[in-house]
Regions:
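Glycine-rich, highly charged phosphate/nucleotide-binding loops
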Residues: 84-93
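Histidine-anchored nucleotide/phosphate-binding helix
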Residues: 25-41, 45
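A glycine-rich helix N-cap at a beta->alpha junction
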Residues: 58-84
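Positively charged, low-complexity intrinsically disordered leader regions
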Residues: 2-12
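Short internal beta-strands
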Residues: 43-51, 71-77
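Short, glycine-rich nucleotide/cofactor-binding loops
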Residues: 15-29, 48-55
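An anion/phosphate-binding loop that grips the pyrophosphate of nucleotide cofactors and donors
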Residues: 101
């Protein structure tokens, strides 16, 4: 696991929040999540304000890989929650979750 030094000399995992707001960047955001997970970085993927538009077999397989690697997938769009297995997140919940991230990557 990827660990960094904490403020008091303790160790903790590195956590990244990948925020995908641009529908044209959905695949790049997902690929970034996979790359981070392969480096043993905790990942929270957020797809905001739109439904996945590029859902094909490759995207579906990559989402399954994110799930296998214990990545977390969230969306505030009901279509993603109902059709693609994302967990629902409100904007206030999003704010709390990304506040715990060491790195925030926007798309």
């Amino acid at each position: 696991m990827r660990i960094k030094n904490g403020a008091a000399g303790g160790k903790r995992l590195i956590k990244a929040a990948v925020i995908i707001r641009d529908p044209d960047q959905q695949y790049e955001g997902l690929r970034t999540c996979i790359g981070l997970l392969l480096e043993n970085i905790e990942v929270q993927m957020f797809v905001l304000h739109h439904e996945i538009v590029a859902m094909d077999d490759a995207y579906r397989d990559n989402m399954a890989f994110v799930d296998e690697m214990k990545g977390e997938r969230y969306s505030n769009h009901s279509g993603n929650v109902e059709d693609y297995g994302f967990r629902h997140v409100t904007l206030s919940e999003l704010a709390r979750k990304i506040n715990t991230a060491d790195v925030i990557i926007p798309f």
